[in-house]
Amino acid sequence: ILQISGERNVEKEDKNDTWHRVERSSGKFMRSFRLPDNAKVDQVKASMENGVLTVTVPKEEIKKPDVKAIEISG
């Protein structure tokens, strides 16, 4: 399971000649993701750019079964 948690602090301010408004939204958050069985958990990478979190989880290739032609007589 991949668990991501953090804290958000955002302040938005609007004003003109007659009024002034400030909105603040903040709080902690947590999100969990179930990873597939073939995830390479020791190679997980994360980066944040412009407020966007990108998490990369590489996966092992699933070996496809060998296909064998069988001759049918008759």
UniProtKB/Swiss-Prot annotation:
It is found in: Cytoplasm. Residues 8-20 have a biased composition (Basic and acidic residues). Residues 1-74 form the sHSP domain. Its main location: cytoplasm. GO terms for molecular function: unfolded protein binding. The keyword Lyase does not apply. GO terms for cellular component: cytoplasm. The keyword Cytoplasm applies. Pfam families: HSP20. GO terms for biological process: protein complex oligomerization; protein folding; response to heat; response to hydrogen peroxide; response to salt stress. PROSITE patterns: SHSP (PS01031). Residues 1-20 are annotated as: Disordered. Keywords: Cytoplasm, Stress response. InterPro entries: A-crystallin/Hsp20_dom, HSP20-like_chaperone, Small_HSP. Belongs to the small heat shock protein (HSP20) family. Forms oligomeric structures. This is Class I heat shock protein.
